[in-house]
Regions:
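Hydrophobic alpha-helical targeting segments used for export or membrane insertion
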Residues: 8-14
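N-terminal signal peptide c-region/cleavage motif recognized by signal peptidases
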Residues: 16-18
Length: 208
């Protein structure tokens, strides 16, 4: 009888050990693939744009925005970016121009007060290089755009406990007329150019 029990117990112990090892490995893989929720440090982040006026680039930015960023550099396929920008926060260092841009001639912020980008797919393209494909909505037009971005770095925050800090830089180009920004005489691109260069710099933190 003992000769039968000992092999059975040994087999059970080996089986339970394998199950535990598989469970631990599966847990580690799940944790590695989980997306992390990041908070934007507004004091060290910016969304900027540049558009030509006749021949000269004119720069602007949006002073505030809302961002929901779920990002895991090791599992970009499980990541998501959702950014909403109130048009009223446009700033080109010229109040008259800012008011004109918010008017019916361009963004028409009374009817469409925000623009929004929501990613549908994020892929890694190279070391620390990614591209977020998503839907950009400006006014009443939604189009698919690509937003390439670089993970500048990620580290434990030296001044905040149990926190990581990361930096992201992104850039893309869109045509304002694709989104109906500029109506009537302002749809022409001789005075205000069609190409809009967008650059985004984000400092992010997450709890660990």
């Amino acid at each position: 009888m003992n000769k039968l029990i000992i092999p059975i117990l040994t087999a059970l112990l080996l089986f339970s050990g394998n199950v535990f090892a598989l469970s631990s490995s599966e847990k580690e893989n799940n944790e590695k693939n989980e997306s992390m929720s990041w908070t934007v440090d507004r004091d060290h982040s910016s969304i900027n744009f540049s558009v030509r006026h006749f021949f000269t680039p004119v720069n602007g930015r949006f002073n505030d925005f809302e961002a929901d960023i779920q990002f895991n550099p090791d599992a970009p396929e499980n990541s998501r970016i959702d950014v909403t920008i109130p048009i009223s926060y446009i700033n080109t260092e010229n109040a008259r121009r800012d008011n004109h841009l918010a008017s019916e001639d361009f963004f028409n912020s009374e009817q469409w007060p925000t623009m929004r980008f929501v990613s549908t797919n994020i892929q890694k393209t190279d070391d620390n290089e990614y591209v977020a494909v998503g839907e950009l909505t400006i006014r009443d037009v939604t189009k698919t755009v690509e937003l390439p971005f670089e993970l500048l770095g990620i580290m434990e925050h030296p001044m905040m406990d149990d926190t990581q800090v990361a930096g992201i830089a992104a850039s893309t180009k869109i045509k304002r007329t694709d989104f109906g920004v500029g109506v009537g005489d302002w749809a022409a691109t001789l005075v205000v150019g069609d190409d809009v260069d967008i650059t985004i710099n984000l400092e992010l933190t997450t709890k660990i």
